[in-house]
């Protein structure tokens, strides 16, 4: 008897903010929905559309007003881009939704990146349900919401610390998202993007956060209900091969704006002993201030550890004189790599990271101990949780009175996660969180149930 095609349970449009750190979790969520028989169309900018290569996903280009120009080029203005994307994106997204109205698969729901709150306006104008997808963790979202609502004054005042939200750990000034604190005056446009996520967020039908049950367990509240943002946890949104393995051949995100160097990395790692390599990566933007870049290099040089460093070619020329030559027998420098593939390799002993949320979730989900060197945005908060809440590594501390982590501190942290009794305890904690991540995404797990509940709501 011929197999029947499973009934499609609805049609969803996903609207991501077009940078790598937002594409990854939202495209992964799209694939997860498709695996559960939901039709998904990704609406993304003309420049970004060709980077999404997953066969099971339909990709439709919409205009941000720049079309063939990437975000982040010299002279790029976040404010100008935001206005242009709102104007052009709203119009072209509406036309896309209209196009499907007359087909046998009209749109049921728009899942929009929280950085694009105008997505809710489009959804409502087209009489669709709407879900806002947050790519930060729940704590960061809750803190930013307080600033957006005026509960905490802007910019954050160091003398007002600690910053408390009922049900969440208190935060020092340096643990706040930096764009409402130390970087508010120098990067106000980034702060505005973060705060603009919240004025209309409670009007959405769903608020999705890329986290999982137990990860940010709120503390007991003596004085009433937790003040954390009410959201549905649907993560970790990383490829299934590294979690529940229920999605066939799901080994990467299927969306890359950069070309990874995979074969060379894997061949090099195969020559190293188990848990002997420090993997060093500071994200798709690769942001390290020049003085910090030098301190990282000195630490790697003095640590005597094997290391694989993802570093832009332009930054290699800024490394201390003699660094490349003196470390060539135990180092591999590449411009980009498949980070999950590297983290999953048995030779990796720790992850020296900026603690962007995607990278932090990947480290947790694969059970890799971490050393956090946060630079800006939400990274300070994530690094705090790495050390104090999850106990899976260390946050490298800045030198007193300076915005820089010295090489001596980095060596201390690297040795702490790679050697001795401290490394044993950290590895035990890392395994615990890895197991919880797998459980959340497995059949009947907390995140799996939440995704199923969303699917059941489609068309109702």
UniProtKB/Swiss-Prot annotation:
Keywords: Glycosyltransferase, Transferase
Binding positions for UDP-alpha-D-glucose per the UniProt entry: 135, 339, 354, 357-359, 362, 378-379
Top-level division of the source organism's lineage: Eukaryota
Active-site residue list: 22, 113
Effect of inactivating the gene: Plants are severely dwarfed, partially sterile and display decreased glucosinolate levels and increased IAA concentrations.
Tissues in which the UniProt entry reports expression: Expressed in the vasculature, the apical meristems of roots, shoots and inflorescence, and the junction of organ or branches.
Enzyme class: transferase
GO terms assigned for molecular function: thiohydroximate beta-D-glucosyltransferase activity
EC numbers: 2.4.1.195
One of the protein's GO biological processes: defense response by callose deposition in cell wall
Listed InterPro entries: UDP_glucos_trans, UDP_glycos_trans_CS
GO cellular component: cytosol; nucleus
Xref: Pfam families: UDPGT
Positions bound to an anthocyanidin: 22
Catalytic activity: (Z)-2-phenyl-1-thioacetohydroximate + UDP-alpha-D-glucose = (Z)-desulfoglucotropeolin + UDP; a (Z)-omega-(methylsulfanyl)alkyl-thiohydroximate + UDP-alpha-D-glucose = an aliphatic (Z)-desulfo-glucosinolate + UDP; (Z)-2-(indol-3-yl)-1-thioacetohydroximate + UDP-alpha-D-glucose = (Z)-indolylmethyl desulfoglucosinolate + UDP
Induction: By high IAA concentration.
Summary of pH dependence: Optimum pH is 6. Stable between pH 5-9.
Job of this protein: Involved in the biosynthesis of glucosinolate. In in vitro assay, may use phenylacetothiohydroximate (PATH), but not phenylacetic acid (PAA), indole-3-acetic acid (IAA) or salicylic acid (SA) as substrate. Specific for the thiohydroximate functional group and does not glucosylate the carboxylate group or a hydroxyl group.
Similarity comment: family membership: Belongs to the UDP-glycosyltransferase family.
Protein name: UDP-glycosyltransferase 74B1
Lineage: Eukaryota, Viridiplantae, Streptophyta, Embryophyta, Tracheophyta
